Amino acid sequence: MKRILTYGTFDLLHFGHIEILRRAKELGDYLVVAVSTDEFNAIKGKKAYHNFNTRKKMLEAIRYVDLVIPENDWNQKRNDVLEYKIDTVVMGSDWENNEKFEVLKDICEVVYLPRTEGVSTTKIKQDLGLQQPVNGVEQIPTPNTMNN
């Protein structure tokens, strides 16, 4: 059985997310998705609209996904590959040549897939007028901060 692993925040789930998951699953038999926790997003300076548990449940409902695990920090990738017996790590092409994934090539294959043209969480936020940088950090309203 060929096992595939990918990482992401997967907030504001959209067609581009579904496509990378579909294409990743086509490369193997079992797809593990590591989704960034709320705490890890804070470390990265990112704010997700949906909390970790909601994003995890949405990913678990997608037919291409076999297992969802938390991504707690940058340094867990090597351990994830070994623990889940991963054959291939798949990421979007925007991560190509990034040391965080290149260092895994001694223990597994690393594949970079082209992003789906014209769709991204950032673009959705911009199109909706929800992306408002604060001190250089992307912010969007949440149900608790919206004025009705």
Regions found by a protein language model. Give the residues of each.
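Nucleotidyltransferase catalytic core that binds NTPs
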Residues: 1-148
